[in-house]
Amino acid sequence: MRHTLFISDLHLEEKTPSITAHFLYFLKHQAPKADAIYILGDFFEAWIGDDNQTPFNRKIIESLQTLARTKPTYFMRGNRDFLIGQRFAAMTGVSLLEDPSVIQLYNKPVLLMHGDSLCTLDHKHQAYRRKIMKPWVQKLMLSLPLSLRRKLAKKFREQSRRHNRTLSYEIKDVTPEEVNRVMKEQNVELLIHGHTHRPAIHDLTINGNPTKRIVLGAWHHGGSVLRYAQDGSFELQAFKIDL
């Protein structure tokens, strides 16, 4: 049956070859069968600018380029790869999506988000997010030498890890009230997002109507894909390959 695939939170980087291998397997064996592929943020562990053309980054860009030649491929930036820009889109052939975006998925309106904006109890991250999403801040960051951007990215990741270790389970998750607010505002019955690394299908009720929130999984222990079929059925699928 015709279907569309959704992935997020691969956190690709050179020092995790297992994740890269799972992504390349996904491109070869799963993506070619889909109508379209949506990547909902944190595809890279860190992205410091489209001008950072390392051998590893070029390898991933070329793999996306091969995919996008034959399949519509959509890319939403996350909190780890928010500096991805139009040059990256031109090099890969992907179409960039704003966060949030409402798409028509087999004639059904579906809200797509990365998901970090839903975690409103994490006040420190929300303050950080408001800063880094300002165009002038991004322009300033991209004007810095690559060597300095690498150091800053490393510093930000270390700070993020330390911060996350101090948070409770509830604070690191989405806020139900914010989910309800956003879904009401966008007038949708289905929300798909990543970020929290807690793959699940949540049944909700909004304005008396049954709704669903699908959370995509991270790729630290294998591949994680949402398969959404033309008839409205869907499944979160995990897979592992022998390395």
From Swiss-Prot:
InterPro entries: Calcineurin-like_PHP_ApaH, LpxH-like, Metallo-depent_PP-like, UDP-diacylglucosamine_Hdrlase. SUPFAM superfamilies: Metallo-dependent phosphatases. It is an enzyme of class 3 (hydrolase). Its main location: membrane. It is a peripheral membrane protein. Its EC number is 3.6.1.54. It holds the Pfam family Metallophos. Pathway: Glycolipid biosynthesis; lipid IV(A) biosynthesis; lipid IV(A) from (3R)-3-hydroxytetradecanoyl-[acyl-carrier-protein] and UDP-N-acetyl-alpha-D-glucosamine: step 4/6. Mn(2+) 2 binds at D42, N79, H114, H195. It is found in: Cell inner membrane. It catalyses: UDP-2-N,3-O-bis[(3R)-3-hydroxytetradecanoyl]-alpha-D-glucosamine + H2O = 2-N,3-O-bis[(3R)-3-hydroxytetradecanoyl]-alpha-D-glucosaminyl 1-phosphate + UMP + 2 H(+). Mn(2+) 1 binds at D9, H11, D42, H197. Its cofactor is Mn(2+). GO terms for cellular component: cytoplasm; extrinsic component of plasma membrane. Hydrolyzes the pyrophosphate bond of UDP-2,3-diacylglucosamine to yield 2,3-diacylglucosamine 1-phosphate (lipid X) and UMP by catalyzing the attack of water at the alpha-P atom. Involved in the biosynthesis of lipid A, a phosphorylated glycolipid that anchors the lipopolysaccharide to the outer membrane of the cell. This is UDP-2,3-diacylglucosamine hydrolase. It comes from Coxiella burnetii (strain RSA 493 / Nine Mile phase I). The gene is lpxH.
